[in-house]
Amino acid sequence: MLLFYVVRQKRDLEASYRKLYDINRSHVETGEKKAPRATNLLKEDQKQLLLDGIRRVMEETDEYCQPEFTVATLAKLIDSNERYVSMVVNDHFGKSFTEVLNDYRIKKACERLTTNNAKYAQLTIAAIGQSVGYKSQTTFVKQFRKCTGLTPSVYQKFVAEDRRNKETGS
């Protein structure tokens, strides 16, 4: 009787993890974000220029994967100041710069965990974390779980399972 209960709990947990994985894959693919908040210190055209610069750096480069990447680094890359960059990030994403940075890093980690690229396919979870800017595996796992609801190893397990299913045509 106890064995039946344990097996059922494990199956239910696996099903919950699968749902979280599927949800997170769709978020990674669509790039969903929270609703913006309003700020009046910058003109709309200034906000848009800053936002375009922020997006360019965060989406077209891997600069944010550097462990020492900060709001000051981002501001310097887009020729602005920290305060304005921080305000635009808070306004557009509805999150702090650190939260947005972690979101981008975890999204990149998910991409690297799902890629068939030989460069990343053989890396350990700690190495994937380092490749996206985390100095500590513990911090990486904590942030990964906070963003996705799964640990990197569980996520990787589902990626492998999806690959096997695609190969067998299931």
Set out the residue ranges of the language-model regions.
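Membrane-proximal linker segments that couple transmembrane helices to downstream signaling/catalytic modules
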Residues: 4-127, 131, 143-146, 153-154, ...
